[in-house]
Amino acid sequence: AQSVGITEMATMLRDDLRALGFQEAEVVPTDGHPGVWGYYNAGAPRTLVVYMMYDVQPVEENWRVPPFAAQLVDTELGQVVMARGATNQKGPERAFLNALSSIIAVDGKLPVNVMVLAEGEEELGSPHYGQLVDRFEARLRTADGVFFPFNSQAPDGSIAMSLGVKGILYMELESRGGSWGGPTQAEIHGSYKAIVDAPAWRLTQALASMTSRDGNTIVIPDYYNGIRPPTPEEQRLINALAARGGDERGRASLGVERYIDGLSGRDVLVRQFYHPTLNINGISSGYAGEGVKTILPHRAVAKVDSRLPYGLSPDTALARIRRHLQANGFGDIIVRQLSGYPAAQMSVEAPIIQAALSVYRKYGITPTLAPRLAGSAPFYQFTERLGLPLLFSGLGYGTGAHAPNELMLVRPVAGSRVAGLAEIEKSYVDLLFALRSAAPASRR
């Protein structure tokens, strides 16, 4: 996400695909970070697209080990590889490539044709992934489904499998001194607040105008319009999830004592999957260091994201936000869209989903199925644009994505129900062979 090592990583992935015997493997330029394309022609009737990402989040302080050394560390769960990208997303992706290598070593070729389309900007909101899809669209449309290798197990070995993702609108809102007031060139002495407007106050007031006082309900006109309610299939999944309970467990995992508005049970799930959010990631203005410095800053900036349920597009959401600010006297607030894409949704009946469920049954696992993930990924490029079903799931446990000490479990302790690296790779082998005999994907 900081444009460090991008060319090296793209080249490494391309070379890995070539080493596996992919007949096509190339680094593909975009207007941003390059993508990587690979094609393995097994002469098979089924074709699988594999979505990959080779970029990672920045590293922070408080790491137990050097974040890019990929050291093995012993924990109470077993031996883990601890590194930035261990679980998000290089660990599962390398395990998948290892599975391909094993099949080729034993059988001489893969059971399905494989297309790899990787990006280096997922952590930036995938602003140029569409250019990669443009380049290979005709060939991608011939595929039967899409797979994103993913560590889905909890520490107890259970799996929560999601059938979709929310979309996202990521924005930067800025207030600067101008004709409305405030210093226009640079910060000034704080004593002048007696006679000069403050961009920092103006920005916070503009932000506050968009939600209820507690920040939990979006009050922008029409913002909830167009959101598709749960289908009958999704209602059944929600009811099954709610019947399992888990409010206390969920709060503990997030480190919170209560959900907003005192939500519990089924209401938590509906709110999480079917309501949009408006979240302030950070606000910066003026001086926030140690000691005392009295200034009136000339600008203030907020990073804001809105998670978008199925039916609310980023373009529509952005237009409604701008219209609201203008109507409420905040037309001077600068709104810059940094990234955005719509939601994606799959059916549990899709052949690739059914193939995954059959593999999990082989390992004695019955996944918990959720209509969608509350997070976001650019899967709409496949599900909505190309009409391809997509699976993002897999054996394996990891934690700490976007945080210090990110890890992926590779050798579980005795008696653990979590898959280690070898079992993860075996499950990917099983999935590829299950896909070989799966029914053709239906086209939307």
Regions inferred by a protein language model and the residue ranges of each:
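N-terminal helical capping/dimerization or prosegment-like subdomains
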Residues: A1-E60, R299, K303, T316, ...
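A short beta-alpha structural unit
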Residues: S306-P309, I334-E349, R372-L373, P378
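Short, solvent-exposed beta-strand/turn "edge" segments of beta-rich domains on protein surfaces
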Residues: V196, E290-H298
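His/Asp/Glu-rich mid-to-C-terminal helical/loop segments that flank catalytic regions of hydrolases
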Residues: G190-N216, A319-R320, S358, I365-P367, ...
